[in-house]
From Swiss-Prot:
This is Divalent metal cation transporter MntH. The keyword Membrane applies. It comes from Listeria innocua serovar 6a (strain ATCC BAA-680 / CLIP 11262). Pfam families: Nramp. GO terms for molecular function: cadmium ion transmembrane transporter activity; manganese ion transmembrane transporter activity; metal ion binding; symporter activity. Keywords: Cell membrane, Ion transport, Membrane, Symport, Transmembrane, Transmembrane helix, Transport.
Length: 448
């Protein structure tokens, strides 16, 4: 009976798996056997931090700054709801990887026809390039703010981080996780310090986490709210998470998978809570520094930087802000490289050397950034940053819907299939995100 069940599960996939996801690091991080809970949890911690990076990349900063400066603390509830949706979707992605041994790209390639799989690959690559554009722009702006390096040269300098990525990959997957966690802590500490300097209204903050009807009734507020929701869940993160959870040496048995799912959920939920604190602190800082002082139209990251020192009365406020921005851009670079490799190998079964893969993605991101910077300067760069987030929003449903489909399929997931209530919630979220992105696309096109 057990053998028959295994055979049925195997038959749910059309083709045998060619190679494990990220084969060079798959099953490479040891998990101590018979260890106590917290020691095991520590061994499983790490992938969640890499995922959380996508929730605090430079692309998210613009929406949080705009929301805080224009509407005060009201949109904090939107950041909270976005985070809850993220926890749900990332838990599905990690479960898919742990149970099936396939990442989302491999599963999609097997399930769908070759032409449709190719379309999904193109869309996923566009999302990764869009993410990389946001990283390039964020790092270039930070270098400009900290050292006065012209934006166009800052964009070119970001190509050098390729060598950092390659060095860390060579050292081992745990090194990448440690660097990412260090940079995340840097960002959190920076914004913690900024918040202390800004003296926010704690009562207004508490009220901001309660959803208000005006978010829906005020068109301008609704648009920024949708922008926060649309830019929070990153499509490449779903591919990434379904792969990197497999770096752990958990037993590939039912009990081992169940334990891995539990620890992975704790890991990602903890890391996404840190991301929530960072995003909330960006909005709180913008509200305390700009909204309460009547500066309601802070157009971009550079404007926020310039206004922080005189508003907060501290000479280091802007510097700390720029350091956090640079850390955010570098963090996202590390995860973008891995996601690109996962997508190309999973959909096309093409295995490029990491240096070639990274150069290809970075060149495709740098070229538009250099052209826009040369032609339009800082204003053009901010427009490109917003455009990259629109591209990400458009692609999201093409990752979310297959993810919900696969994790709701008993033949693929066996006893780990989504429960009836989880299916209802997951499909509701998928439909909501699809509607949200259609609305955002329509609004963007009509406002051109």
């Amino acid at each position: 009976m057990k053998k028959e069940k295994t055979e049925r599960t195997k038959q749910s996939w059309r083709k045998a798996q060619n190679a494990p996801s990220l084969s060079e690091v798959n099953n490479s991080v040891a998990i101590p056997k018979n260890a106590k809970f917290f020691r095991k949890l520590f061994a499983f911690m790490g992938p969640g931090a890499l995922i959380a990076v996508g929730y605090v990349d430079p692309g998210n900063w613009a929406t949080s700054i705009a929301g805080g400066s224009e509407f005060g603390y009201t949109l904090l509830s939107v950041i909270l709801i976005s985070n809850i949706l993220a926890v749900l979707l990332q838990s599905l992605a990690s479960k898919l990887g742990i149970v099936t041994g396939r990442d989302l790209a491999q599963a999609s390639s097997d399930h769908f026809s070759k032409p449709f799989g190719f379309v999904l690959w193109i869309l996923a690559e566009l999302a990764i390039i869009a993410t990389d554009i946001a990283e390039v722009i964020g790092s270039a702006i930070a270098l400009n703010l900290l050292f006065g390096i012209p934006l166009i040269w800052g964009v070119c300098i970001t190509a050098l981080d390729i060598f950092l990525v390659l060095f860390l990959q060579h050292k081992g997957f745990r090194y990448i996780e440690v660097i990412v966690i260090t940079l995340m802590v840097t960002i959190l500490v920076c914004f913690g310090a900024e918040m202390v300097m800004s003296h926010p209204d704690m009562q207004a903050i508490a009220k901001g986490f309660i959803p208000q009807s005006e978010i829906v009734t005020n068109p301008a507020m609704l648009y920024i709210a949708l922008g926060i929701l649309g830019a929070t869940v990153m499509p490449h993160n779903l591919y990434l998470h379904s792969s990197i959870v497999q770096t752990r040496q958990y037993a590939r048995t039912k009990e081992g998978k169940r334990e891995a799912i539990r620890f992975s959920f704790i890991d990602s939920t903890f890391s996404l809570t840190i991301a929530l604190l960072i995003n909330a602190s960006i909005l709180i800082l913008a509200a305390a520094a700009f909204y309460t002082t009547g500066q309601h139209n802070v157009a971009g990251i550079e404007d926020a930087y310039k206004l922080l020192n005189p508003t907060l009365g501290s000479s280091i406020a802007s510097t700390v802000f720029a350091v956090a921005l640079l850390a955010s851009g570098q963090n996202s670079t590390l995860t973008g490289t891995l996601a690109g490799q996962i997508v190309m190998e999973g959909f096309l079964n093409i295995r490029l050397k990491p240096v070639v893969r990274r150069l290809l993605t970075r060149v495709l991101a740098i070229v538009p950034a250099v052209i826009i910077t040369a032609l339009y300067g800082a204003n053009g760069i901010n427009e490109l940053l917003i455009f990259s987030q629109v591209i990400l929003s458009m692609q999201l449903s093409f990752a979310v819907i297959p993810l919900v489909m696969f994790t709701s399929d008993k033949q693929k997931m066996g006893e780990f299939v989504n429960s009836p209530w989880l299916k209802i919630v997951s499909w509701s979220v998928a439909i909501f995100i699809a509607f949200l992105n259609i609305y955002l696309l329509f609004y963007t096109l009509t406002s051109l």
